[in-house]
Amino acid sequence: VALTDPTRDRAQRLRFSDKVPARGRDVATVLIDGVETTDLVTTAIDVALRSDRGHALVILDAVLRRGGDRHDLLAELESRPTRRGVQRVRALLELADGRIESAGESLALLVMHDLGLPRPELQHEFSVDGRCIARVDFWFPEQGVVVEFDGLVKYRAGEVRGARTAEEVVIAEKFREDAVRAVPGVRGVARLIWREVLPGGDAPITLRRSGLPVPLASRTTPTW
């Protein structure tokens, strides 16, 4: 449990809770089920400052996806009396994007950024004869490479599959990927899974094989 303490100017980690310092600053709060909590922007910055870069970006993307304002997040960040972690979170706010649809996509974007790749187009739609045939997570137009994060939920979770079996979902995904590969200008497709985007994973190898300019020295996924 994280608690915001207006009497503290330094963080404190206890066995069952973390105390976030709030001395000298106004803390915006809201009531949720009768419990006073910090508002969305304040909470997001509190968590981002105390998290590694991967988890922080997941939080920031989620807030933007829910309608949060980047300028409000930045203003809250810059208002903090401590400078520890501010530069790191400021850089993540430049990378964060509300079009990211899942935690896995957030981590994939961070990994590609850390590998020095150009910023991809997000949620790019491919159309043939005026009909959208696919919307992909990441598109690198100069390299002609599509990157998808495959969280595997679509194959396992019934609420995602609907009435389809896992086998039917796999077949549909195969047809979809074939259609994307057939689009003029698409020269490669890479699928990243969870273990590849985690530190020490094989994301650099998968991305390099697709045709993206990943440095040869990058053999495993960087630490966030």
Predicted features, each with a name:
Residues H71-D72, R99, S127-A134, P141-V145, ...:
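Basic, glycine-rich
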